[in-house]
């Protein structure tokens, strides 16, 4: 396995003792992972790609120049800068961010496209669960649309599914 994928690998240790005509075996399963990453992350390249919505332009430039061996360190430092409570062992913001990514993968994935890459996924990752959702569908045509409301920040986002396949796109571009 590649080292960047080993951090979540399910492993098993088996010990066998041969004594005279008898063999006794015991096994123990465990999971090895990096303590600075949430449980949902098992690939550093994917985790860094999923950070694209919050990376600064300078961080993006730096990331493009990195060797594979330097990516975990970049990940740690980028999240350390964003840690709302650096005195604790847990980075609450990182955990929430990747919980949202996991939600988008579960709810907004279409075909081979990851849910986090979808327009709905991007908005959900950046702003969380909407305060309210209005859904509309047209019986005469195939299109449907949804409007997500975020009252606390005074934002609303309209998504349109032009063809009725569940592929909702932002009606108006959003620059993050």
Q: Where are each of the predicted segments found?
A:
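Short, aromatic- and glycine-rich surface loops/edge beta-strands on solvent-exposed regions
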Residues: 7-21
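Poly-acidic low-complexity segments
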Residues: 1-2, 16
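Residues within mature, well-folded domains
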Residues: 3-6, 23-176
């Amino acid at each position: 396995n590649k080292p960047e994928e080993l951090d979540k690998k399910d492993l098993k240790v088996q010990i066998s003792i041969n004594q005279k005509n008898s063999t006794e075996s015991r096994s123990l399963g465990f999971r090895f992972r990096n303590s600075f990453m949430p449980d949902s992350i098992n690939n550093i390249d994917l985790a860094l790609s999923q950070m694209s919505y919050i990376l600064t332009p300078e961080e993006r430039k730096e990331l493009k120049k990195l060797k594979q061996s330097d990516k975990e360190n970049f990940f740690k430092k980028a999240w350390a800068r964003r840690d709302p409570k650096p005195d604790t062992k847990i980075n609450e913001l990182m955990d929430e961010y990747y919980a949202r990514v996991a939600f988008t993968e579960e709810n907004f994935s279409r075909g081979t496209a990851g849910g986090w890459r979808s327009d709905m996924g991007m908005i959900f990752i950046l702003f969380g669960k909407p305060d309210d959702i209005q859904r509309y569908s047209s019986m005469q045509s195939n299109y449907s649309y949804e409007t997500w409301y975020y009252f606390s920040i005074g934002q609303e986002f309209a998504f349109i599914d032009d063809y009725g396949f569940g592929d909702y796109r932002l009606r108006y571009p959003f620059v993050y």
